[in-house]
């Protein structure tokens, strides 16, 4: 009779080997993905009065889309190594919507300058290196190339961003983007 402890140890060993093999297969494709956004970031400057004089502080107001539609087409495939199988996927995303621009009163009482020309749109992607191609975003009928990395690591650890030219007289603007990401289960 085989001791129960030996069987449990063998099962744990095989489970560990399966997880390692699946990670190895996925490493050349892409990890599990989480996609967040887009987020519009608008920097602004405040001059705060104080006992020691005026302090000048730069802040960022973050705005989420008023409306957003996402169409995702997902294709999966299995890859095998030895007796182990990993499920890989490729997800094609089409994202569009509308951002309402904030009124100047949303920026705070002591705001002296809203830096509309330094606005940025970010999309958080767990592993942006798994993007299938260069990503563009169209904002108010103008096309911008999205750069690798988030504009501000405080909101996303990884992702893509584009600096966009905004006009303070706009009330809202449309956006759309399409990108494909590789990932694994």
Predicted regions, residues:
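Hydrophobic alpha-helical transmembrane signal-anchor segments
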Residues: 1-9
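Soluble non-transmembrane domains of integral membrane proteins
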Residues: 16, 20, 27-28, 32-37, ...
């Amino acid at each position: 009779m085989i001791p129960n402890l030996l069987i449990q140890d063998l099962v744990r060993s095989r489970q560990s080997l399966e997880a390692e093999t699946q990670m190895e297969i996925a490493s050349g494709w892409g990890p599990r993905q989480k996609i967040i956004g887009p987020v519009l970031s608008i920097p602004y400057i405040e001059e705060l009065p104080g006992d020691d004089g005026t302090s000048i502080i730069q802040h960022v107001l973050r705005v989420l889309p008023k409306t957003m539609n996402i169409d995702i087409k997902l294709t999966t495939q299995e890859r095998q190594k030895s007796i182990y199988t990993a499920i890989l996927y490729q997800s094609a995303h089409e994202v569009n919507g509308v951002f309402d621009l904030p009124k100047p009163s949303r920026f705070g009482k002591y705001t002296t300058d809203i830096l509309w020309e330094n606005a940025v749109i970010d999309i958080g992607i767990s592993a942006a290196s798994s993007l299938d191609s260069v990503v563009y975003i169209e904002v108010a009928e103008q096309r911008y190339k999205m750069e690798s990395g988030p504009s501000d690591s405080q909101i996303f650890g990884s992702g893509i961003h584009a600096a966009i030219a905004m006009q303070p007289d706009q009330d809202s603007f449309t956006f759309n983007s399409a990108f494909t990401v590789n990932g694994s289960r």
